[in-house]
Amino acid sequence: MANKLVLISLLCVVLVAKITQAAPQYAPGDEPSYDEDTDDSDKLVENDTSITDEDYAAIEASLSETFNTAADPGRRLGEGSKP
């Protein structure tokens, strides 16, 4: 039992040592370097202002329409009804 405990503790120490060595090392006062950002600002598109008041009215009207009225796709027509 003691051998297992010693072995498990040794493995934990090795795991902690591996993790700490894998972390980047910086001297005091050093700042980490990051990848350079690419300048993709030329690909940005302004907001679309081509939507008119009529378009907004059509959208508002469609919100009051009924929806989700399709038949249940899990059932076949005629199934489940008692003769």
Swiss-Prot record:
Outcome reported for the amino acid change (mutating R75K): Reduces thrombin binding. No significant effects on anticoagulant activity
Signal sequence residues: 1-22
Keyword match Signal: yes
Residues with attached carbohydrate: N47
Region (Blocks exosite I of host thrombin): 56-62
GO MF, one annotated term: molecular function inhibitor activity
Key words, A-Z: Blood coagulation cascade inhibiting toxin, Glycoprotein, Hemostasis impairing toxin, Platelet aggregation inhibiting toxin, Secreted, Signal, Toxin
Spans annotated as Sufficient for host thrombin inhibition: 54-83
Main localisation: secreted
Region of interest (Disordered), ranges: 25-51, 64-83
Tissue expression notes: Salivary gland (at protein level).
Disulfide links within the chain: none
Region (Blocks active site cleft of host thrombin in a reverse direction compared to substrates): 72-75
Variant or mutagenesis effect after changing R76 to A/N/E: Reduces thrombin binding. No significant effects on anticoagulant activity
GO CC term (a single one): extracellular region
Pfam families named among the record's database cross-references: Anophelin
Activity regulation field: Increasing concentration of NaCl decreases affinity for thrombin.
Biased composition (Basic and acidic residues): 73-83
Effect on the protein of changing R75 to H/Q: Reduces anticoagulant activity and thrombin binding
Location of this chain's protein in the cell: Secreted
Family classification: Belongs to the anophelin family.
Role: Salivary protein with anticoagulant activity that inhibits host thrombin (F2); binds to the proteinase in a reverse orientation (opposite to substrates). Inhibits thrombin-induced platelet aggregation.
Subunit field text: Interacts with human F2 (thrombin); the interaction results in thrombin inhibition.
Note: Does not inhibit host coagulation factor Xa (F10), factor IXa (F9), activated protein C (PROC), trypsin, chymotrypsin, neutrophil elastase (ELANE), papain, plasmin (PLG) and thrombin-like enzyme batroxobin from Bothrops atrox.
Protein name listed in UniProt: Salivary thrombin inhibitor anophelin
Native source species: Anopheles albimanus (New world malaria mosquito)
Lineage of producing organism: Eukaryota, Metazoa, Ecdysozoa, Arthropoda, Hexapoda
Gene from which this protein is expressed: AT
